[in-house]
UniProtKB/Swiss-Prot annotation:
Name of encoding gene: ssb
Protein's name in the database: Single-stranded DNA-binding protein
Cellular component terms (Gene Ontology): nucleoid
CDD domains to which the protein is assigned, alphabetical: SSB_OBF
Organism, scientific name: Thermosynechococcus vestitus (strain NIES-2133 / IAM M-273 / BP-1)
GO biological process terms held by the UniProt record: DNA replication
Length: 120
């Protein structure tokens, strides 16, 4: 029996990178910064990969600064470096569930409300 479950809560580091495939599949990649308990520590950065309907939700609603809660599993992308021939790998969290906990706009008092049109 094996167990590969990851739970993270953090802020998105940049707008999602979205790919649409001819098959109809949607893939979304983004980074998540998770703070450590001490204020002096730098956050840990995680690469997330999201597929399907959840990826489309991320594409439509997630932006840099959005607070997310995710549940997923750890996987490794593996490839061979074209220049050196060395085998490389990169850890990725394959997201199964994503909860949008707040947007950057929710915490920024100077942010313009959605749908705001200035009077001229």
């Amino acid at each position: 029996m094996g167990l590969n479950v990851v739970h993270l809560v953090g802020r998105v580091g940049g707008d999602p990178e979205v790919r649409y495939f001819e098959s109809g599949s949607v893939k979304c990649r983004l980074t998540l910064a998770v703070n450590r308990p001490s204020k002096d520590d730098q956050p840990d950065w995680f690469n997330l990969e999201i597929w399907g309907k959840t990826a489309q939700v991320a594409a439509d609603y997630v932006r840099k600064g959005t607070l997310l809660g995710i549940k997923g599993s750890l996987k490794f992308d593996r490839w061979q470096d074209r220049n050196t021939g060395v085998d490389r790998s990169s850890p990725i969290i394959l997201v199964e569930r994503m909860d949008i906990l707040s947007s950057k706009r929710d915490t920024d008092p100077n942010a313009v409300p959605a749908g705001y049109v200035p009077e001229i």
